[in-house]
From Swiss-Prot:
Ranges that cross the membrane: none
Protein's name according to its UniProt entry: Acetyl-coenzyme A carboxylase carboxyl transferase subunit beta
Main enzyme class: transferase
Single GO MF descriptor: ATP binding
Keyword Nucleotide-binding: yes
Function (record text): Component of the acetyl coenzyme A carboxylase (ACC) complex. Biotin carboxylase (BC) catalyzes the carboxylation of biotin on its carrier protein (BCCP) and then the CO(2) group is transferred by the transcarboxylase to acetyl-CoA to form malonyl-CoA.
Subunit and partners: Acetyl-CoA carboxylase is a heterohexamer composed of biotin carboxyl carrier protein (AccB), biotin carboxylase (AccC) and two subunits each of ACCase subunit alpha (AccA) and ACCase subunit beta (AccD).
Keywords noted in UniProt: ATP-binding, Cytoplasm, Fatty acid biosynthesis, Fatty acid metabolism, Lipid biosynthesis, Lipid metabolism, Nucleotide-binding, Transferase
Residue ranges constituting the CoA carboxyltransferase N-terminal domain according to the UniProt record: 25-294
Major site of localization recorded for this protein: cytoplasm
Classification lineage: Bacteria, Pseudomonadati, Pseudomonadota, Alphaproteobacteria, Hyphomicrobiales
């Protein structure tokens, strides 16, 4: 059959002008196995309609759905030294960067922009997990700090969507330095009395969790997101005990008071706009009947009196 498959079929296809069908037209839900057409999934912000499972979404797509009418102005990220340690593991770090940049068309994993949500001016910063696992390095650290400086200069709130596996090992201590540096920028934001809201997406771990991802005024998590410092497998091997079901999930963290609410991506924009109106004392906007989906997964934590 090989000669038919490898020779005859391509010849017939070329004669008839038949085009090959792309492999990514249908996306499989990892939880239910449901197949969803890629255009439908993109229109639904990469949330599976039936199960509500949140797929990974690119930084550009997230900003497009988050800002009013999909309109925003990108904030230019500062330039940094590339591969200062001349790091090499299985391949050179500089080569890894070139591969990701060519594949995704971005310099690193942070995209920041100016725009409005329900008419409110805002700065939004998004980590793209597709670029080296959203790892925190010099470039991403500088980009986050630049976003805070821009928000302070514009006197507007900042919303950060965190998605990261932690510090970038290829940059060593220079990567770890970004943890205190971003913390200082957050303190400047607080001194300016401007809201800083963090949206924790799947996954948010490592040094990112240990720094700017857990220093917001309000912490919102997407459903089913894994949030923690070390991964559950590492913790279980260290303490040699079975972990509770759903350990480090956004719902588990909500139940134990580590996040303020769990909100569906489909309701994120309306929820954040409502919070900012309260924090900034903006007039309340008339709330349309469809502002929240019927099966909204918004949950607000209840703090017990000490």
């Amino acid at each position: 059959m090989n000669w038919i498959t490898n020779y005859v079929r391509p010849k017939i296809n070329s004669i008839l002008g038949r085009r090959e069908i792309p492999e990514n037209l249908w996306i499989k839900d990892p939880t239910s196995g449901e197949m969803v057409f890629h255009k439908d999934l993109e229109a639904n912000q990469y949330v599976i309609p039936a199960s509500g499972h949140h797929m990974h979404i690119s930084a550009k797509n997230r900003l497009m759905h988050f800002f009013d009418d999909g309109v925003y102005t990108p904030i230019e990220n500062p330039k940094v030294v590339t591969d200062p340690l001349k790091f090499r593991d299985a391949k050179r770090y500089i080569d890894r960067l070139k591969e990701y940049r060519a594949k995704l068309g971005v310099d690193d994993n942070i995209l920041s922009a100016r725009g409005t949500i329900e008419g409110l001016p805002i700065i939004a910063t998004v980590q793209d997990f597709a670029f080296m696992g959203g790892s925190l390095g010099m470039a991403s650290g500088e980009a986050i700090i630049e976003a805070f400086h821009t928000a302070i200069a514009d006197k507007c709130p900042l919303v950060l969507f965190a998605a990261s596996g932690g510090a970038r090992m290829q940059e060593g201590t220079l990567s770890l330095m970004q943890m205190p540096r971003t913390t200082v920028a957050i303190e400047m934001m607080k001194e300016a009395r401007l809201p800083y809201i963090v949206v924790l997406t799947n996954p948010t771990t490592g040094g990112v969790t240990a720094s700017y991802a857990m220093l917001g005024d309000v912490h919102i998590a997407e459903p089913g997101a894994m949030i923690g410092f070390a991964g559950p497998r590492v913790i279980q091997q260290t303490i040699r005990e079975t972990l509770p079901e759903g350990f480090q999930s956004s719902e588990y963290l909500l139940e134990h008071g580590m996040v303020d609410m769990v909100v569906s991506r489909l309701d994120m924009k309306a929820t954040i706009a409502k919070i900012l109106r309260l924090m900034m004392k903006f007039p309340a906007a008339p709330e349309p009947s469809h502002a929240f989906s019927k099966d909204s997964q918004t949950q607000i934590s209840k703090t017990k009196a000490a």
